[in-house]
């Protein structure tokens, strides 16, 4: 592992060096710094200085920074190129019967200072162009920085291992604090990119707080970066790639022998796996491609599906355009593992309602997505005791994901799928029924909310409050769905209350926002969108593909919505008061009546209470309805 540190003070010679014709290199004095990048002329301690011209490329530079004793070449690459040309000329001379040139000497290792200074000058223009390009491509979202946000508030982020569907989610175990990596050295005035070793101080999803080796307890130059970025490498990568390791300018005079320092510091330390970047690349390959056809829920009529076409794929998230959309603006966002999308023919196979397309044949280039690419549901046995129409249960309201409501099974489909209606809110034609699988983590047996101290939303118009299941079942002549039929699996998900993450706003699924886990009930997570009121919170399963680690948006190039500011919330409040939006069934901004409004309407201010949860972060509701939009 320590072979990589030779590049800190020496350059590893190649196997062809024995044939090169350059003379032996005079070693630099041991007390000379590894690199002087303070703008002064490169000189030896005895004060000698001057200029030289490279005999290979013609570059003019400081003589002391040139390569070899004779200072004929600006870099080892020019020296070797010159030697290669000389060798070819010698062979040609032999073929022509001319006497050969003198025998080449063995090329010895060259101290880094000479090679690096000339190489830096040679690549200055290219490096500046690269910096300009990088600066132009950077996306700034109102100046939001996960690193600053976490540091200033002492937040913690959910580990990447909590998100099995995310890149590297299943192979993140080796990444931890104190792991050493090679990263670009930004504390350097050289115009070319050089590297140095840094240790992970803190992890926040894909992001890591790093500290350069040599700073010890000094945090003045600590910085955040995305571990899956292209400039992050395991220790030893620089040596294998011929890249220079240069200590930061702030501490360059701290040690006279940096190689010995690194060997001592890194003995027994962990680094990234050698194939880490390859694993990152492989984990970001997605089988869904543009022009694939799928069946997806109709966002205007939740009880049915429609055909849609994959327009784009970003980090496994699909932008689907409904096939009949002429201007291609009628779209829907979801993850490729979402339970809302299915293969063509799925609706017919299970008896689900389906909106037939007016398009009689496939458009050119469009093709059906292979069925094996879709998420598999758990097989169930419907031959014995099973769900029946009319049975009561509790379910997350798909049109108001902050609430768990009294619900009814309206239809039993094939393969374990159920059509669920929210009591008191159903349309007469059943157009707002929603399809859940029997193993879905979004449906619960009667009494789940009471046992877990979650507020259960009663049917709209139901006046006998507080709501009691026993009384309601008797009044409606209904029975509760058997508890044993529900999914009771609780994975060891690793989430903790207070953890930060990036979460899809499922009411506006094109938006991914800064969010916090505020409550955990078995496998159920309550997700709060930072900067927004609690009425916008959403109940989400721990294995939902709509949750991502901190840094996911940066990694995939998706736009992250920062926490809403006070001014934006106030403007939202003002606009909502001026214009009340009509009720719709879209996954887009629809919000039902809040608890406070329901209380005022039903009881005219009389005291009442629901079953409150044990968490201090439980939503209290609000009398004002805001429509959450992009900040």
UniProtKB/Swiss-Prot annotation:
UniProt key word Zinc-finger: yes
Keywords noted in UniProt: Acetylation, Chromatin regulator, Chromosome, Metal-binding, Nucleus, Repeat, Transcription, Transcription regulation, Zinc, Zinc-finger
Gene Ontology annotations for the cellular component aspect, listed alphabetically: NuA4 histone acetyltransferase complex; nucleosome; nucleus; site of double-strand break
Localisation per UniProt entry: Nucleus; Chromosome
UniProt zinc finger (FCS-type) residues: 45-80
Single GO BP term: positive regulation of double-strand break repair via homologous recombination
Name of the featured protein: MBT domain-containing protein 1
Organism: Mus musculus (Mouse)
């Amino acid at each position: 592992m320590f072979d990589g540190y030779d590049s800190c003070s020496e350059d590893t010679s190649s196997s062809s060096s024995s044939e090169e014709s350059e003379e032996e290199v005079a070693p630099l004095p041991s007390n000379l710094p590894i690199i002087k990048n303070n703008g002064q002329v490169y000189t030896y301690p005895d004060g000698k200085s001057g200029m030289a011209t490279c005999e290979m490329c013609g570059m003019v530079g400081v003589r002391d920074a040139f390569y070899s004793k004779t200072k004929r070449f600006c870099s080892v690459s020019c020296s070797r190129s010159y030697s290669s040309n000389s060798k070819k000329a010698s062979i040609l001379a032999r073929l022509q019967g001319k006497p050969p040139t003198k025998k080449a000497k063995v090329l010895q290792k060259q101290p880094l200072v000479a090679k690096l200074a000339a190489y830096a000058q040679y690549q200055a223009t290219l490096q500046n162009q690269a910096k300009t390009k990088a600066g132009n491509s950077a996306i700034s979202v109102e100046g939001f920085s996960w690193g600053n946000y976490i540091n200033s508030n002492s937040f913690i982020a959910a580990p990447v291992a909590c998100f099995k569907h995310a890149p590297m989610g299943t192979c993140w175990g080796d990444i931890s604090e104190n792991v050493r990596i090679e990263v670009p050295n930004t504390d350097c005035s050289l115009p070319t990119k050089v590297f140095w070793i840094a240790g992970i101080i803190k992890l926040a999803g894909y992001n890591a707080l790093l500290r350069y080796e040599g700073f010890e307890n000094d945090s003045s130059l600590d910085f955040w970066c995305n571990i899956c970025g292209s400039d992050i490498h395991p220790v030893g990568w620089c040596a294998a790639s011929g890249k220079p390791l240069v200590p930061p300018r702030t501490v360059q005079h701290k040690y006279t022998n940096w190689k010995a320092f690194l060997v001592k510091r890194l003995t027994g330390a962990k680094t990234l796996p050698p194939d880490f970047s390859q694993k990152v690349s492989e984990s970001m390959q997605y089988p869904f491609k543009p022009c694939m056809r799928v069946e997806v829920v109709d966002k205007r009529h939740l009880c049915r599906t429609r055909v849609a076409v994959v327009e784009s794929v970003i980090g496994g998230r699909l932008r689907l355009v409904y096939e009949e959309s002429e201007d291609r603006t009628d779209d829907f966002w979801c993850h490729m593992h979402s339970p809302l999308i299915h293969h063509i023919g799925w609706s017919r196979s299970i008896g689900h309602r389906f909106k037939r397309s007016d398009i009689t044949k496939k458009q050119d280039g469009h093709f059906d997505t292979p069925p094996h690419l879709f998420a598999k549901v758990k097989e169930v046995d419907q031959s014995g005791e099973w769900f029946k129409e009319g049975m009561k249960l509790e379910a997350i309201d798909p049109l108001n994901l902050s609430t768990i409501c009294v619900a009814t099974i309206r239809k039993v489909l094939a393969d374990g799928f159920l059509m669920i209606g929210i009591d008191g809110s159903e349309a007469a034609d059943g157009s707002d029924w929603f399809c859940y699988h029997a193993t879905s983590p979004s449906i619960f047996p009667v009494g789940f909310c009471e046992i877990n101290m979650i507020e259960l939303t009663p049917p709209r118009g139901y006046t006998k409050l507080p709501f009691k299941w026993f009384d309601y079942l008797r009044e409606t002549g209904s029975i509760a769905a058997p508890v044993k039929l529900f999914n009771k699996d609780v994975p060891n998900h690793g989430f903790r209350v207070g953890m930060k993450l990036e979460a899809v706003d499922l009411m506006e699924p094109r938006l991914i926002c800064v969010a916090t886990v505020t409550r955990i009930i078995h496998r159920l997570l309550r997700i709060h969108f930072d900067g927004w009121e609690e009425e916008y919170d959403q109940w989400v399963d721990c294995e939902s593909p709509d949750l991502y680690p901190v840094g996911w948006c940066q990694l995939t190039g998706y736009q992250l919505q920062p926490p809403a500011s006070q001014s934006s919330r106030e403007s939202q409040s003002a606009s909502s008061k001026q214009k009340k939006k009509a009720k719709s069934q879209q996954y887009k901004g629809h919000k039902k009546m809040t608890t406070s409004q329901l209380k005022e309407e039903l009881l005219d201010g009389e005291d009442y209470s629901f079953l409150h949860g044990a968490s201090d972060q439980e939503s209290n509701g609000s009398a004002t309805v805001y429509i959450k939009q992009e900040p």
